[in-house]
Each structure stands twice: as C-alpha cells, then as structure tokens.
Amino acid sequence: MASTIQALPQEVVYLITAGEVIDSFAAVVRELVENSLDAGANRIVVYLWPQQWRVRVADNGCGMNLDDLQQAASAHSTSKIRSSADLWKIHSLGFRGEALHSLTTLADVEIISRAPENVGWRVVYGDSGKAVHVEATAIAPGTVVTVSNLFASCAARRQGLPTTAQQMKAVQATIQQIALCHPQTTWQVWQNDRIWFTISPAATAGQLIPQFLPQLRPSDLQEIKLEIPNPENPQLSTNNKPNASALALVVGLPDRCHRHRPDWVRVAINGRMIKLPELEQTILAAFHRTLPRDRYPLCFVHLLISPDQINWNRNPAKTEIYLHDLSYWQEQVTQAINQALRISAANIPESVQTTRVSQLLKAAEEKGNYNFNPRNANPADNTQNYLKAVAQVSNTYIVAEHPGGMWLVEQHIAHERVLYEQLCDNWRLIPVEPPIILYQLSPAQVAQLQRIGLDIDIFGEQLWAVRNLPAMLQQREDCAEAILELSWGGDLQTAQVAVACRSAIRNGTPMSLPEMQKLLDDWQRTRNPRTCPHGRPIYLSLDESSLSRFFRRHWVIGKSHGI
C-alpha cells in the first residue's frame, strides 16, 4: 500500500510560513520598520495605499550593499544570527530571516538601498525571493522597501481582512507601540499621498505618551528608570554591567489619570512590545486600592534585560515569549511601581495644580520639591517633615506648608489611607465582652463574617452574638452598625477598607495643630499616599511660583509698592 504521507512542495511550505508571519497591513509595517530600526535608523517614513494594497517604508539606516541586497529576500537569510547559540544572544528586533521572503511569496517586493560610501541599487524580487532585476540608482544612504499587490495570490485572505478603517487603526497602534519602545525615532506616516500623522522624537517614553493621549499633561505621568541585578546572582552590584538589567517605568499618577479599560497596561522587553499576562496582572495588582472602582491604570513597563533571560522562539510575530525567572521580574515590577507612586523628591517632580486650578491661576505647570519618608526608610531620616500643618478649613481640610508652596489635605481620606495600610499589615481581631448582638442576619451574612475571621454564633431566635471584632472598632459606639456593614460581602481587603473608612477621622471634626501634624506625618509615610483605598485623590497642591504669578507679584518686585 502506497504511503499517504508526503513531503510538502517547497512553495507550499513557503506559503504556509508566509501566512504565519504576514497576516495584515499592520504585520507588513511591523516587519519593515523593525528592519529599519535594526539598521540604526532614527527617521522612518511609512506610506500606505490601502486601496492599492501597497506599502512603502523608507529609512535613513545603514543601508545594504549589492551582495546583501541580492540575498536579503532569500528564505531563512539573516545578518542577525549565525548559530543556535546566537538564539540566546539576540539584541536585534528581527532574527528569523523570514519576513522579506514571506513578503515575496505574498506580494511584489522592491528594495532600493545604499550603504555609506557606496552607490545605490534597486532590486526587484521574484516569488522565491531571488533577485530578478538589478540596476544602479541614485538614493541617499538608507533603504526604501515597497510592497505592492499584497495578498494578490490569496483572494480569500483579502476578503477575510477587516475594513480598511480597522486595518489603518491597527497600523497606527502598531507604529505607536514600536515608537514607545524607541522614543528617539522620528516617524512620518502617509495615507493615500496625504500626511496622516507624525510622531516627534522624545528623550523618554514618558515624554512621548502625551503625543498619543493629548488629554494627558506631562505632569500626570511619573517616570523612573532603575538598574536591577539579573536573577542569577541578585547580590552582585548593579555596577557590574554584564550582570545588571534596567527597568524603565512610566505610570499615570492614580490621583490624576486612569482609564475605563486596561488598554494602557503595556509591557515591553528589549525594545519590543509583548503580551505577558503574568506581568500585566502584576501591574494591575500593584495599583489595587489606588483607583476608583472599574478603572484601570496607565502603566508602561520596559525591561532591558540580558538576552539569555528570554526565549523569543515562541511566536512568529515575537509578541509572546518565555521569560526565565518570571517571579523575580514580577517582584521587580511591583517594587518599581510602589516607588513611583510615592511622593518623593528623589523620584517625583511634583506638578501641583489640577486642570481646574491651573485654568484659574493661568499658570504653566511647575515642579516642586516635595518628599516623604517611605515605610522602610532609615528612622534617622524621619525627623524631617516635608509638610507643616498650618490651619484647618471647614473642619475638613488641613492647610499644610512646605518649602515649595502649600497643600490642602482632606483629613478623612488621608486618615483612611493610613488606617487601611495599618490594617493590611496587621489585621487584628480582639475579644469583646459583652458580645455584640445582631438581629436577623441571613446565612450569607453569617458566612461572610466568619470568612473574615469574626467569631459569631447563635444567641437566640434570629439573634447572633459576635464575640470578637477588629481592634480599630473597639472604641466606637456604632460597632453593631460597622459589623453589619462588613456582613454584606466582599473579601478581606474590602472589609479592611470598610473598617478603615468607618474608623477614620470624620470630616467636620475639629483638630488641633499637633493632631493635624501627626496625621500629615503618618500619611506621608504610607506606601500609596496619592489616593484613598476607594481611589479618591487625597490632596491638592499649589506651588509658590504659580501663586506668585496669579497675584502678579513678579510685576511689582523692585517697584515702590512696599513688597
């Protein structure tokens, strides 16, 4: 009986491979601009003609000589790696040698390129990736790749693609993601011979994001960059470069910006945006109890780590990877986010007005020099108070002075943040005598109280006795109402938030200056001082220079006004 299993013809193999690598306009743009970045380009121009199924990418990179041009579109040809050992030393965006060859299988491809000190060449490629036409041409150093008649040989592929508008939206998202990882690059994108959008270069990703989200102000973002040891030997000094990695982080400050979906929870590794659900969940967990309900953070994490920590050989688009010691990197990301959310002069140039106040003052954003002492700081450093209590307004807001201006702090939610973090660190239940009697609890309410650790048993018909309670509620007169509130569901953290909220100083409560100062000191030492556990902003800050401009003090300095 003849065998039914046969080797596929080479052209079928290439067509299958091409379909895995190139599946859309966005994939074409992604592969071509990644080649441009690998060539050292810092200016990239993308031309799109979606109705003609044509894409062109031009760059000012290093270009190619004639020998490389003739080989560039051959199957599995690359300048990035030479052996299997090089798979663990990848510093480039591309390395498979499949993209250009796949494009020649699915479209007509032409490349014009010139290396410095050489003449330029134009090469047209056939279906197999071989050069079928070569001619000298005039071109500035760099490369121009034109892909025409995309998917002409795959009518079903064209019909299965989304609408033109959706494809162009995907192209824009792809370019923005790549630009975020390479902020020093200038981008210009044309559609149907008209300029579509541009991206100006920036020193950092944090300076680039407002170009994508115009409603954001630079002061809404906090950006830090940390050197961290590789997990093989975390005890080694980070000054030992071969054993050190870097973590660049941009976060939207939770008291100023958040989103209705997690579309800006993004992770990049070594210049490429990736999908890593474990790290994305780590980011969301780090922002827990800092944002309003059903809101999500703006957070971009870019890990620059040793190539031997990554296995890129998981997905043809290289958007999914295997990352070694994942738990270690999760811990580093959590610590970096916690550091970024603190109010520290070492890492936050504080912008001080909300949009409404900024419009009132008609002043540009200014940077203050605030700081606070984190929980794990040296106790000797805790002697300096960055905020000095001055007064209380409406028995609700604490007016605080600092070297750069003044703050208004709402006393209830500041105290709520302090108590919540204390409860998270030490959830302590104490016996209560006589027991607190509750009436007409449902089985679900009883189960909820038992789930958070309360000792509750039947005391009579429709009566239950609670024999312990959270220590913070001990001195309150409304213990029964507080416990009843805890019975309505939620996890332990929800219960801790409820206890903190009920135990915190009420708005409308007069406070002495020493009491206000102690609250400010305690609040400055919290891990997440910007918002309460419900996500509300705790403070409003006004810097001295903005106040001076509003009162026009700089107009009269030096004149005879006695000022």
Swiss-Prot record:
It comes from the Bacteria. GO terms for cellular component: mismatch repair complex. Keywords: DNA damage, DNA repair. GO terms for molecular function: ATP binding; ATP hydrolysis activity; ATP-dependent DNA damage sensor activity; mismatched DNA binding. InterPro entries: DNA_mismatch_repair_CS, DNA_mismatch_repair_MutL, DNA_mismatch_S5_2-like, HATPase_C_sf, MutL/Mlh/PMS, MutL/Mlh/Pms-like, MutL_C, MutL_C_dimsub. Transmembrane segments: none annotated. GO terms for biological process: mismatch repair. The keyword DNA repair applies. The keyword DNA damage applies. Belongs to the DNA mismatch repair MutL/HexB family. PANTHER family: DNA MISMATCH REPAIR PROTEIN MLH, PMS, MUTL, DNA MISMATCH REPAIR PROTEIN MLH1. This protein is involved in the repair of mismatches in DNA. It is required for dam-dependent methyl-directed DNA mismatch repair. May act as a 'molecular matchmaker', a protein that promotes the formation of a stable complex between two or more DNA-binding proteins in an ATP-dependent manner without itself being part of a final effector complex. This is DNA mismatch repair protein MutL. The gene is mutL.
